[in-house]
């Protein structure tokens, strides 16, 4: 089952967008094969965070994380940042050799920024490249507006739901943006 062609999908929820000031409060991972078939779902963890980080969230984060139940899960969590990092690495090791999978997801550069600051060992588990579904979305918006308008995200803003949505979105773009003769 371990393959350097497997893909690691990751999503983080944070208290804001500033990787220097805000905190990761949820992490989830999924491993797929190269054809985007799900091989395994990693642990989904709300990460304990000092209350002042939650109190400092902007209106968007306060509303969305509150409505989804994430804020309450974070307040009740006993999982530290270090524990979440190590549990995630432990989950990934049987599926992908270190340094082989690009970091996969939507707007994944933002997640990478937070990982560099708060989970550097996990960030180093990934290849330096990204497989960012939002890049395809931006190209479709500019060059194939019909394709762009054909996919609607639900936007749950829970880490695991967002990963599955990103995988489905990439499948959609694969089917609708790339020429059939180049698909396997």
UniProtKB/Swiss-Prot annotation:
Domain Exonuclease positions: 7-170
Subcellular compartments: Cytoplasm
Keyword Cytoplasm attached: yes
Gene3D superfamilies, sorted: Ribonuclease H-like superfamily/Ribonuclease H
GO annotation, biological process: DNA metabolic process
Stored Pfam families: RNase_T
Any single Gene Ontology cellular-component annotation: cytoplasm
InterPro entries in the cross-refs: Exonuclease_RNaseT/DNA_pol3, Oligoribonuclease, RNaseH-like_sf, RNaseH_sf
Protein name: Oligoribonuclease
Originating species: Hydrogenovibrio crunogenus (strain DSM 25203 / XCL-2)
Gene: orn
